[in-house]
Every structure is written in structure tokens, then in C-alpha cells.
Amino acid sequence: MSRIGKKPIELPANVTCERTGNAIKVAGPRGELTTIIPEKVEVVMDQTKVLVKRHSDSREDRSYHGLVRTLIQNMITGVSTGYEKSLEIVGVGFKAEAEGRNLKLTIGYSSPIIYAVPEGIDLKIEKATNIILSGIDKEKVGKVAAEIRRIKKPEPYKGKGIKYANEQVRRKVGKSVGA
């Protein structure tokens, strides 16, 4: 049996979870999220916890068992506390500015890069080199952070570029001058 899938999910007091057909809707103080549940698993709910069960022990059913449990857990955490990703910009003259729902990046290209931040993601700029993305959907927050990082990945020689706040950039030694 899936070790992750068989654990019950505790529902915080301010979060409600309801099932409509094959969709699960989780609502809390920060908003609400909905996801489609595959027919391979069954979700059993009561007032304080959610339990995910599977119909058979086939390989596919076992894989969905843990996946669905984790997706529901991420939805509950998102609507109760939310998710946050921090990015750092490293480089002389590199900076970020917020212009409404757009992020303007000045990162060494001939013109500034404008990135449109999707709905459901909150953008906060601390100093000019720290970007904080937050939202209730873990997948969406991570995807937006990865797209922003992809604009200028940190390079290994000087470490310039956009990196996650906790990311360690492996540095390489540059060319040595001939003797």
C-alpha cells in the first residue's frame, strides 16, 4: 500500500472540502481550489479529515493513490496558509520593478524584459534584487518562478542571473593566463 496515500489528511478548522462528481473543491480563508480526481481512487471525507482509497492494487492505481493524496494536501495547505517562492537577481545593474500586473526586468539585455504575471499570483519586490511570488496554487507559483528564472539562468563563472533564494550556483574556475 502507498505509504503516502494511506495517511489521512487533517482538515484545519477554517477549511472546508466537498466532492461534486469526480471533482474536489477545497475552500479556506485565502480562496478556493478545485481539481479533478481520477476514477481509480475514491475520496472519503468527514468533518475533520480526508482519506484517499484505491480500488485495486494495480501499478497505475497505486501511483494515483499517493498522487491524489498529495494534491489534496497541497490544496488544503494553499487555501489555509498559501505558498511562496523567492527569487534573487545577482549582477551589477540588474534589477526588477513591478508595473501593475507586469514584472519589468533589467538584466543585461539591450532592452528591459516585461513578464506578465498570471492571475492568482501575487508579486512583491523587496529591494530591487529580491522577487517574492505567492499564491494558493503550489503548481502555479512554482511554474511562474521557473519561467522568471528561465529568462536569465545563473551562469557558472560569475553567478550572474536570476536564481532561487536557497539555490547554490556551482561556480567554475575561469581561464588561467598563460605563463
UniProtKB/Swiss-Prot annotation:
The GO terms describing molecular function are: rRNA binding; structural constituent of ribosome
Database matches in Gene3D superfamilies: Ribosomal protein L6, alpha-beta domain
Q: What GO biological process terms does the UniProt entry carry, in alphabetical order?
A: cytoplasmic translation
- In terms of superkingdom, the source organism counts as Bacteria
Do you know which Pfam families this protein is assigned to?
Ribosomal_L6 (PF00347)
**Record-level GO cellular component terms:** cytosolic large ribosomal subunit
Q: Which UniProt keywords apply?
A: Ribonucleoprotein, Ribosomal protein, RNA-binding, rRNA-binding
- The answer to keyword Ribonucleoprotein applying to this record is yes
| Keyword Nuclease listed | no
Chain's role: This protein binds to the 23S rRNA, and is important in its secondary structure. It is located near the subunit interface in the base of the L7/L12 stalk, and near the tRNA binding site of the peptidyltransferase center.
Subunit (UniProt): Part of the 50S ribosomal subunit.
The family classification in the record reads: Belongs to the universal ribosomal protein uL6 family.
Name assigned to this protein: Large ribosomal subunit protein uL6
Top-level taxonomy: Bacteria, Pseudomonadati, Thermodesulfobacteriota, Syntrophia, Syntrophales
